[in-house]
A protein has these predicted regions:
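Hydrophobic alpha-helical signal peptides and transmembrane signal-/tail-anchor segments
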Residues: 1-17
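Extracellular glycan-modifying ectodomains
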Residues: 18-255
Length: 255
């Protein structure tokens, strides 16, 4: 019995440390939280616990995070975290975030108070703190080191929640954004596979659908009930069915 337990422990350790790695690419803490819930989070990467968008992740990787790490690019903002679905607002909480204004080309976006609307916002660390700055340096170095390996890699991204009308109006742009990012990232490292989730607040008889399946990435639509909140880690409100659906999908991929 003891030997069986030891064997399973060693097997699991080898599995999560040498067979594949899972990277959180945003757009907020939900992706890192799910990796953690699956006991697959063995180390930290730079986009684990902040607000980030795919175009900014591309620029960070391309520039070796020079604009990310420049503390002069940040301002402190009192922000409000909320969901906006088909023009219906759901308040989550108030936060204090470091907003990277280098990436905010629209002055109206800089003046925005919506936490999840920013291109890059740090709401759980402070780059002016030396320990936090060193933390991000380690995360960045670790990401590039991982890119140099042949190990199987997965990246996980959750698109900000939207209403069904928002989705229908923006569907093609979202799919193009996902595809463009994947085309970029597969040129930066070997053996990487993307997993995208689009969250839609819309009551359906089905919990989710696989919107697209390819050799390089999958896209899933997760249908969320009226009391679901896209906030916290991984979600808030009445989120238990949706959480289990995501875990089930990820387990089928990873395990």
């Amino acid at each position: 019995m003891i030997y069986d337990i030891v064997f399973l422990f060693v097997f699991y350790f080898i599995l999560i440390n040498y067979m594949y790695k899972v990277i959180s690419f945003g757009h907020r803490c939900s992706s890192a939280s799910f990796i953690q819930n699956l006991n697959l989070k063995t180390e930290s990467y730079p986009f684990d616990w902040l607000v980030s968008k795919l175009d900014i992740i591309k620029d960070c990787i391309e520039t070796r995070f020079v604009h990310f790490l420049n503390v002069n690019n940040y301002i402190i903002q009192n922000t409000e975290s909320f969901n906006m679905t088909d023009n219906v607002k759901t308040h989550i909480c108030n936060e204090i975030a470091q907003v990277n204004i280098y990436y905010e080309t629209d002055i109206q976006n800089i003046q925005s108070i919506q936490t999840y609307h920013y291109k890059l916002a740090i709401n759980h660390h402070n780059l002016n703190n030396d320990n936090d700055y060193q933390y991000y340096q380690r995360c960045i170095n670790r990401l590039y080191e991982l890119f140099e390996t042949d190990i199987q890699k997965y990246y996980l991204y959750f698109h900000p929640i939207m209403g069904i009308n928002d989705f229908q109006n923006n569907k093609e742009n979202i799919l193009n954004e996902f595809d463009n990012f994947n085309q970029y990232i597969i040129e930066k490292t070997k053996n990487i596979f993307g997993i995208y989730f689009i969250l839609i607040k819309h009551n359906e008889n089905i919990k989710s659908i696989k919107l697209k399946e390819s050799q390089k990435y999958n896209i899933f639509v997760l249908y969320c009930n009226d009391n679901f909140v896209d906030g916290g880690g991984p979600f808030m409100g009445n989120h238990y069915i949706e959480k289990e659906e995501v875990l089930s999908i990820l387990k089928n991929i990873f395990i």
